[in-house]
């Protein structure tokens, strides 16, 4: 609020600011709108950050292990490291570019994944799920036979994933038990009564992320392979 001091005023009244400078009465106007409104780029950056933050919670089973050593070195949480490493993993249309996502970081020697196969039989009632097996080159190059191989299967349709029980590098294969609906989503059919049938034609692609961890806790960089629905 402006105050009267003799023949002059000082203070703020509306968008006007009154003051005295070297004995003279002065005033200036405040802008009625923000000088630099949020640009489209800033809005996109905020949106991308929110998406990566959500993805870090969906993939926490993987990055809590795969980025643990890296987070210790950086003196930060694995969530923060995950967001930092994946802040630019986006397609031109603003979707997360899943093939570029990083869930582990390190210098442990990687392996080559040679195949990924699914048991074609539908899980029976009461079973835990359908076995999904990934084989990899078990020959040891720069790593050790005792290194652990971790496999994380991400299902974007439900924004969830599953971490398989780790196996030694020397084993050459790892099996994950996946929910039936990930592989063969149900669809209603008319056969006199409403029933559900399971078909791979409605399936969504799976994304496989793997890494190795040494006995000292160090990890490898992320190994990624897609599993398109056409392969099921």
Locate the predicted segments by residue.
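Long, polar/Ser/Thr-enriched low-complexity segments
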Residues: 1-116
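Charged linear interaction tracts used for macromolecular binding and regulation
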Residues: 71-232
